[in-house]
Amino acid sequence: MDATANQFAAGKHYKMDFEVDYRFRIPDEGYMIDDDGNIHIYNKTGLFGWNKIADEYRKATVTLEKEYIDEPAGDGIKVIDMGNELWEPISAFGGVFEGNGVTIRNLQIANKGFIATNTGTIRNLTLENVSFSADITEGAGSLAAESSTSVIQNCTVKGVTATVIKPVVFGGLIGRNSEGRIEGCQVISGTINLNLSGAGNSNYGGLVGEHFNGTALIIN
């Protein structure tokens, strides 16, 4: 039997040349969960995808995969542009969030912060052009409203805008830091409008609104 375009003769050997494409393809979901239960994020879609499953993976290591993230200005700065799409805060996080020097830009937060309560480690992350979609009536901070027994390292906020109308704790980076370590962090600019009504204690700060308990540290 002769070999045709669709057939091969029995008992004969044929040489076939073909290429295998081993290049990684970003999942449609924008994130991937590895065999250890850790989460790898590649874009805006991936961040919102993580938001939906974060309660199931509170202790996970979450990594912004810098190699695959856009560099819009060609200046070496990798950016995930959220386009001011509303972000509901991660309710609680106790793992490791590795920002890898990536900037999350145009982040519009519904309330509290990027994360509501953090007991984990957040590092090497920049938040740029942060806003709150509604007037603030409870404790809040751009990165986290509450950070306890945690580590915040090398994190920056470049521009935050908020209006506070109740006596609360508010910080440009962290609202309340309790028994946590904040190292190498900064808030470069922000506008906080105070239009308060009602009774209660208020604490506001450019970096941290309230910093308390004996082992809480702010370094550099």
List each language-model region with its residue ranges.
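Extracytoplasmic cysteine-anchoring/structural motifs
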Residues: 1-26
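Surface-exposed repetitive/solenoidal architectures
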Residues: 11, 23-220
